[in-house]
Structures are given as structure tokens and as C-alpha cells.
Amino acid sequence: MKPQIDVIHGDITTMHVDVIVNAANPSLMGGGGVDGAIHRAAGPQLLEACKTVRQQQGECPPGHAVITLAGDLPAKAVIHAVGPIWHGGDRHEASILEEAYRNCLRLAADNGYKTMAFPAISTGVYGYPKAAAATIAVDTVYRYLSLKPMPEKVTFVCFDEETLHLYQRLLTQRGQELEI
């Protein structure tokens, strides 16, 4: 069965999906960009849940992901993924970013979630080149969904038009029919 992957331009905090992915930092305590937006929209319960995870597991290293409740968000849960900081590509950034996406997909499936939304992990303050990050994201999600039944649908939520067009082009090359 062909994977169900879509892309939209919008605000990930308003997505009515089972789980949204947060591009988190290792502390899980919120920050700038999408991380800060998710924490603000979710309310104080999300920060408390992240504090509990930190107390139990410590910091979340790059490539890893953890799951928490969603607080005031319309989603059921939030998966916090820590992507790599871009250092020019010679510090295994690509494999770390791929691992982050894979771990998110695995956590969603393991928890029975059928629909999920991703931001463009590591492309904000972490400086990962958008085109390279989009290619890794699409390839990783496509490969995973081609082999596994869950999650059933993944949506990439793009903050800007440039990123949206990158994802649209990549998904079209993969033969995805996009709702535009």
C-alpha cells in the first residue's frame, strides 16, 4: 500500500492529528521557534510532563525522541525529537536527523497513533539546510511507511512557503498525490 504523506503550510499547534512532533532541544524545557510555539499553545502541563521525563531519563540526545501528553493542544500526544545542530555535514548530521524521524515514527506506532504531523526538524536555529533536511525527512518517512502499517498518515507542516515548495517537489517526485 502506498504511504499516505501530505504537506501543508500552517501552524502545527492547530493540527487535529493523533500526535504532533516537536523539534525540541536536549533539555526538553522549551525554546524558540516551533518548540516555543508548541510549549505556549500546550500550556503548563506540557512543561511539567517534560520535567518529569527529564527527571526520569535526563537530557534527550540528538537523534532521540520522547513522548508526552499534549496539554491544551488538539493532538493526543507530543513527540519531542532532538535533531542535530548543523556543523557543515561532517559530524554525522544526516544520520542523526534520519534517526530522529525514525524514532518519532516508531514511538507513534508503538503507542497506537494513526496520524501524525512533523515540522521541519533542525532547520530553524539549528541551521540544517532546508533542502537537505527535507530530502532526509521525506525519504525516511516514505521508507518507514512503506514497510510498516502505522502510522497510517503523516503530514509535514511547513512554516514558510520555501519549505512548503521543497516538500511538495519531493513528494511529487515520489508519486504522492498532494491536496493543494
Curated annotation (Swiss-Prot):
InterPro entries, per database record: Macro_dom, Macro_dom-like, O-Ac-ADP-ribose_deAcase
Domain of life: Bacteria
GO molecular function: O-acetyl-ADP-ribose deacetylase activity; purine nucleoside binding; ribonuclease inhibitor activity
Role noted for this protein: Deacetylates O-acetyl-ADP ribose to yield ADP-ribose and free acetate. Down-regulates ribonuclease 3 (RNase III) activity. Acts by interacting directly with the region of the ribonuclease that is required for dimerization/activation.
Subunit (UniProt): Homodimer. Interacts with RNase III.
NCBIfam families according to UniProt: PRK00431.1-1, PRK00431.1-6
Protein name: O-acetyl-ADP-ribose deacetylase
Gene: ymdB
